[in-house]
Amino acid sequence: TIQNHGGYLTNTNWKDPVYPEGSHLPEAKEFLSATKVSDDAFQYLVKYFEKQDEPTIICMFGDHHPSIETEFYETLLGKKQSDWGLEEIQKRYATPFIIWANYDIEEAKEVSISNNYLENMLLKQAGITLPLYNQYIEKVSQDIPAMNVNGYMDMNGKWHNYGDSESKTVSSLLHNYEILQYGYYSDSDKTTMKKLFQWK
């Protein structure tokens, strides 16, 4: 939410503050307390739509953890920031998500997915046919189950830096995805669009 996006030094007088036990981390306290309020608001939203007749789907997710005290993450991960590798960095981008509906949909737990694939999951839950662009994303997800700004996950759940021992299949999928994504969001660039239409 906008409320939870920062900064985290507002000294808000929370009615029921949430903070890491045994520590004095004001930024962490601010974020966790605001998250609790957002969680309560989400519960209110769901309870409202539970009573509505119109079919409704709600999706809530985060894209990364907040920029709060480094000490908080060092304690959480058990390592100094200087010793973090790709696996530890990725954990700062691992956030929960939920897709809820006021009618029966397919349920799943412990799903690992990246934000770029979440739209497809939502469309399929809603029974909407995937547009061509999303169909390609679906194809990519079959070989690359998750990706973000730092790297990608292979089918065994291991994270890699881009360009790090990529197979020909993965390299080709990522290259074509980059072209398609650029065209999808920047179709006014005619030169790049020509490259897009040359893609097979």
Task: Walk through the language-model features, giving the residues of each.
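Solvent-exposed soluble domains appended to multi-pass membrane proteins
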Residues: 1-200
